[in-house]
Amino acid sequence: MIPELGHLAMILALCLALVQATLPLIGAWRGDRQWMSLAQPAAWGQFAFLAFAFACLTYAFMIDDFSVAYVAQNSNTALPWYYKFSAVWGAHEGSLLLWALILGGWTFAVAIFSRQLPEEMLARVLGVMGIISVGFLLFLIVTSNPFTRLLPNVPADGRDLNPLLQDFGLIIHPPMLYMGYVGFSVAFAFAIAALLGGKLDAAWARWSRPWTIIAWAFLGIGIALGSWWAYYELGWGGWWFWDPVENASFMPWLVGTALIHSLAVTEKRGVFKSWTVLLAIAAFSLSLLGTFLVRSGVLTSVHAFASDPERGVFILAFLLLVVGGSLTLFALRAPVVRSQVGFGLWSRETLLLANNLILVVAASMILLGTLYPLVLDALSGAKLSVGPPYFNALFVPLMGLLMAVLAVGVLVRWKDTPLRWLLGMLTPVLVASVALALLASLLWGDFHWAVLGVCLLAAWVTLAGLRDIQDKTRHKGLFKGMASLGRSYWGMQLAHLGLAVCALGVILTSLGSFERDMRMAPGEAVELGGYRFVFEGAAHHEGPNFISDRGTVRIFDGEKQIAVLHPEKRLYTVQQSVMTEAGIDAGLTRDLFVALGEPLEQGAWAVRIHIKPFVRWIWLGALMMGFGGFLAAADKRYRMKVKTRVRDALGLQEARA
């Protein structure tokens, strides 16, 4: 009965989504306030029904209701309860229900927190989000119903959750990623609503920007969590593989980064209006592309769900409809909102435009490398692999250029900046950056140009931020001046510092890692990177749904024992899958990583040992960027009720066609 109620709730949510997708838009077109007012209650009801459907599916997992096909395929009586909970979104049908729920949640949040918007604008925004909901709910109900029954042939037990997904990181990684993916639908909806109304002004950018920043922050943290999971779970110490599905989440993040900066220019200066709406369309379109890649069956990946062709065709059709429709609307309406506001060469507008172009080129390069092998295979049957050499050769220089531009962009002013003043600000920053980079290279030991270059760029970005703080607080005193700066400013500073930290982590762990694969018998020791690793053998261990050989490795720094690690080789009994669980001694400046390979004769094992310097800085920097986004979105100016348009408050002239 509970699964049937969940299925009914999805159908009712679809009905409300249809109402939300049609009547408010018609009402905005006709100027009918009653029809426009239907948008908010429809959004509330849709979210409530989706939450109920999700709760029904969760309940089915918790009570081991194997009459539900999705539960039988992804759970087991021996599965711990917390993995039963994460199994709700562990495969295609449940993950799509989670997607629909999060979309409903974003829509509900917009309906609640955007009441200060003009009535027509809010009706259009919620109407566009309703159209997106209709597409996903139709896909969910028609092709991917998670409540399908196995009656009367109910299995006695389930097939168990994929062992790769039985990990804490995979409990939180997909929801965070989906919050970002789906969150870009809000920016998309604001852009389409503004196009429909012909008002891509500073007010639109101000309303849209906090939602976009929050989605960007969630997506960035989700990507970082996925990288962290791959590092410790897959057993060989890698943290980024340029996997097509990794790329599919990274591309909208890059375009989203460009979008939040472009929105800032539109909000402050009323320029880049058409470009900004194009970025909003691109960010959400790339999110849909990621959905297609994961669920269409065109990829073989640890991330991809096995799916039938019908699902792929449905998502591809929806993707083409959204992209084609939005670009057609853009082509028709963009000329209406052209701006005639000018700015100089050495201005923040120019530097942010350069920022945008670099990020879009980087995303386009990744898109080409991801899709070209798929298109070639589909058209000719030829197999081609585009791997890390291609991506690294193009992406790394672009990010170096981005960091160089970023530091200048922080210091320049809106509209125009005197070149002499700018050089006076940048010269001490450059001198100090060179000195710090040389010092860091000396401390690193082995000289490497890449280490010197990235240390220089990281110092350049960090010191430029400090120079800007000093400039903004010089009249009020340091502490009083810092207190007067808004959360948006501090969020920007934290995010930029996070980029510098992440870049340092990437280059230092890439060039400074030690790795060794060897045979180790009980009692045998090996020296690596100044540490001594002593293998004491492996013992049998039983878990709730697996058996394992658990090794013991003691690590010494000189004569001092600093860690005891327990890497495992697990056999998940239901699916007979063998998994490697690494033992990791984590530190701020290095990780000691030990993984078991295959058992050998006389109690010996193949053992892999890594020393990863500064690898945690990669995820620390990503978290700093994400939390910087949340801090910026919490700025008080985004929480103030605005009764007049921002463009009027800023004194900007009306854009002419």
Where do the model's predicted regions map?
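Membrane-interface interhelical loops and short amphipathic "cap" helices
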Residues: M1-A9, D32-S37, Y59-E93, N145-P174, ...
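Contiguous transmembrane helix-bundle modules in multi-pass membrane proteins
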Residues: M1-Q34, F52, F66, P244-P252, ...
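A conserved hydrophobic secondary-structure block that centers on an alpha-helix together
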Residues: I11-L25, W29, S95-S227, G235
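Membrane-interfacial loop-to-helix junctions in multi-pass inner-membrane proteins
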Residues: W29-L50, A109-S133, L196-A217, W242, ...
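Hydrophobic alpha-helical membrane-insertion segments
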Residues: Q46-F61, M129-V142, L279-S287, N356-L367, ...
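Transmembrane-helix bundle segments that line or gate the permeation/cavity pathway
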Residues: L50-L79, S86-A111, F139-R149, F250, ...
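Soluble non-transmembrane domains of integral membrane proteins
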Residues: D517-R608
